[in-house]
Regions:
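Alpha-to-beta junction loops
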Residues: 33-34, 67-69, 84-94, 135-136, ...
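Bacterial N-terminal signal peptides
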Residues: 2-15
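Extracytoplasmic small-molecule ligand-binding "clamshell" domains
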Residues: 21-93
């Protein structure tokens, strides 16, 4: 199973009760689209709202396309999703296996991401293939990167959050950090004096790259089609790219 940041993928989210699911007509009748998001997880989302996070901004744009407003449903753990009653989750892995038991329905993908290596500007590393028993890599606990590197006997240092791994990197405690390009890019934007070099995704490692989509909680066909069409419009007119760029993130096209 592919693992990424909390609330970035549906694999970490619990099922809502089927009775809580709403159709497109019900969403339009209520006037609001519910988005489950973490209240303190920039660049993804922030309840404080300064900045709001790209999930909130994209959620607002998507809701506008559907003719409604956005209602953020703030959750911290997977268990809260059962009672939150949200309609969508953003930045989920577009892979049924990765969704586990969430049963989230997946839109067409709108960008590609994964786990990349962040290194110091002076590092000679250029890919995962360059890692060996002499390079220590920061990984998230229980992540696919941790498992992949462990199988190769690459020394790792475990962290609970990507920001901690990046801080350890700039403090010369590790040689590289296995993180999402999203978080590394935002780190560079907010720490210009400590900017790291982000290596390209290694597509030769199939478990370390994936497409990203909108996760929908038991939608009807009308909602699925409406979300797909809305996201296609927002991608075509540059809205999606502009939103992520405000957080220092350059999107890659899905494959």
């Amino acid at each position: 199973m592919k693992i990424i940041l909390p609330l970035m993928i549906g694999a970490l989210l619990g099922l809502t009760d089927p009775a809580q699911a709403r159709t497109l007509d019900a969403i339009r009748e209520s006037g609001a689209l519910g988005l489950c998001a973490h209240p303190n997880a920039l660049p993804f989302a922030s309840k404080a709202g300064n900045p709001p996070g790209f999930q909130i901004e994209l959620g607002q744009a998507l809701a506008h396309e559907l003719g409604v407003s956005l209602r953020p449903d703030w959750i911290i753990t997977q268990y809260q999703m059962r009672s939150a009653g949200c309609d969508i989750v953003l930045d989920v892995i577009a892979d049924r296996e990765a969704q586990g038991e969430t049963n989230l329905k997946i839109s067409k993908p709108y960008y590609r991401t994964g786990v990349a290596l962040a290194v110091l500007p002076s590092s000679q590393l250029s890919s995962f293939k360059g890692l060996d028993e002499r390079t220590k890599v920061g990984v998230l606990v229980g992540s696919i990167a941790a498992m992949t590197l462990g199988q190769r006997h690459v020394p790792t240092s475990t962290f609970g959050f990507e920001i901690d791994s990046l801080e350890a990197l700039v403090n010369h405690e590790i040689d590289a950090a296995a993180v999402t390009p999203t978080m590394a890019s935002y780190f560079n934007q907010t720490h210009p004096d400590k900017a790291v070099r982000i290596l390209d995704l290694d597509e030769s490692e199939p478990n370390l790259s994936w497409n990203v989509a909108v996760g929908m909680v038991r939608p009807d066909d009308a909602l699925r089609n409406a979300v797909d069409q809305a996201m296609e419009r927002l991608s075509a007119d540059g809205t999606v790219e502009r939103i992520y760029h405000r957080y220092g993130v350059t999107l890659q096209k899905p494959k």
